[in-house]
């Protein structure tokens, strides 16, 4: 009997069984898991946040047009999809406890399964759709202050005016405050996702500033930046600010950033970067010192400078809370820091020639972008100082503290601290372990 053919068939059958995906394997696909989490976030945002954001701003219809190759900055937040010539996301307050949400001429084969949008047949005619709902005010994405809320191009604006006609287009108003509120007021599923993002970012940052990556006298700043980007690529993450800022600080300030400067013993290294995960974008900093030959611990002067910065951060943590405008809270925070014995800086990097520790804060909105569009206690976001801080707003708690170093002839070392948090009625609450130390590279 010739057993070879039978044996061959058995081998083939076993191989097929071994290579076949197990039953239910699709439920473990990372792409599907991320999609499911984003759907949950979108449903929660549309159900919980969008009604109050539209009603508080007096807008009963919000139209977000886009076309292929010209996607609005809110494309990810609203659910993406394929757009041919022109498509629209349209949100209408028709009363009750929910907002009608419709995608017109934006294709997504998973939209029904996601469940965030209403499936309204025959919605290809935008003008007829809008006339049937007869809104009082139509919000559009234009803004002088916030680029993320300014996605409507001149051509698409002209198209809207022509398509809707003079009577309806006269009702168009800027939706920038609506967009800010919708983006920055968080639901629980977002807070979980953002906590995951900050923890991922923390782990990458702390590994980057260690001997795992850095060999003194060999590794360049660019090597560290590329290592970070490789980690992001391998883990399917975005980058909040493209190339991470990995820089050396000296008596005259920043000496080199993410370039071919070789890291040497005695260097003080700072890093500023962010990761993108599940449409959540972080903004985080870490710091390291490269021990000189014979050193076993951080020099006392640098430790004191770091400790001073930590004290400033602790005042922010204890003082900042929801319930006031960002300007009122910023004034309260800076007064509390000054009362704790620190000197408020007159302007960013405008250092006094004295023995004081100076500070400046830039606690800004974060989340849908590395620099978000919610209320901000930051000198570089003046248009958002009048926005009220609401519970669940995400903030990057950013500060700079400048302390004299004796070995620098009294010139000041700038210590930047930045970790991401949620601000509640109780105060600042961290979402992952924050920076409590200067890392040592041996």
Give names to the regions the model predicted:
Residues 10-18:
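Sec-dependent N-terminal signal peptides
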């Amino acid at each position: 009997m010739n057993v070879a053919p039978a044996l061959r068939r058995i081998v083939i059958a076993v191989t097929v069984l071994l290579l076949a995906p197990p039953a239910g394997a699709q439920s473990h696909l990372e792409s599907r898991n991320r999609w499911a989490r984003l759907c949950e976030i979108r449903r929660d945002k549309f159900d919980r946040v969008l009604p109050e954001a539209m009603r508080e701003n007096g807008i009963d219809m919000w139209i977000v047009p886009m076309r292929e190759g010209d996607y609005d900055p809110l494309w990810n937040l609203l659910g993406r999809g394929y757009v041919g010539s022109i498509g629209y996301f349209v949100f209408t307050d028709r009363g009750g406890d929910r907002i009608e949400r419709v995608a017109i001429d934006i294709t997504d084969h998973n939209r029904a399964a996601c469940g965030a949008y209403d499936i309204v047949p025959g919605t290809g005619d935008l003008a007829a759709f809008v006339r049937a709902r007869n809104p009082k005010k139509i919000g559009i994405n234009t803004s002088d202050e916030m680029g993320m809320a300014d996605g409507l191009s001149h051509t698409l604006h002209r198209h809207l005016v022509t398509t809707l006609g003079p009577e309806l287009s006269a009702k168009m108003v800027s939706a920038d405050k609506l967009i800010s509120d919708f983006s920055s007021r968080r639901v629980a599923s977002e807070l979980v996702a953002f906590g995951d993002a900050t923890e991922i970012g923390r782990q990458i940052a702390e590994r980057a500033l260690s001997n795992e990556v850095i060999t003194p006298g060999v590794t360049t700043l660019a090597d560290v930046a590329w290592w970070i980007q490789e980690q992001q690529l391998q883990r399917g993450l975005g980058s909040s600010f493209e190339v991470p800022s990995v820089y050396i600080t000296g008596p005259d300030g920043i000496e080199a950033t993410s370039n071919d400067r070789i890291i040497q013993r005695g260097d003080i290294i700072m890093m500023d970067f962010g990761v993108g995960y599940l449409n959540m974008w972080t903004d985080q900093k870490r710091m390291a010192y490269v021990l000189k030959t014979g050193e076993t611990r951080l020099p006392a002067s640098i430790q004191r400078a770091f400790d001073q910065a930590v004290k400033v951060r602790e005042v922010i943590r204890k003082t900042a809370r929801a319930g006031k405008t960002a300007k009122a809270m910023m004034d309260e925070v800076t007064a509390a820091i000054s009362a704790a014995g620190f000197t408020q800086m007159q302007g960013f990097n405008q250092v006094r020639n004295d023995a004081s520790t100076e500070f400046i804060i830039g606690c800004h909105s974060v989340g849908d972008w590395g620099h978000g569009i919610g209320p901000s206690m930051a000198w570089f976001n003046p248009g958002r100082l009048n926005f009220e801080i609401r519970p669940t707003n995400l903030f990057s708690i950013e500060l700079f503290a400048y302390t004299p170093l004796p070995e620098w002839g009294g010139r000041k070392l700038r210590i930047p601290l930045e970790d991401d948090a949620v601000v509640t009625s109780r105060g600042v609450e961290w979402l992952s372990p924050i920076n409590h130390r200067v890392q040592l590279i041996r």
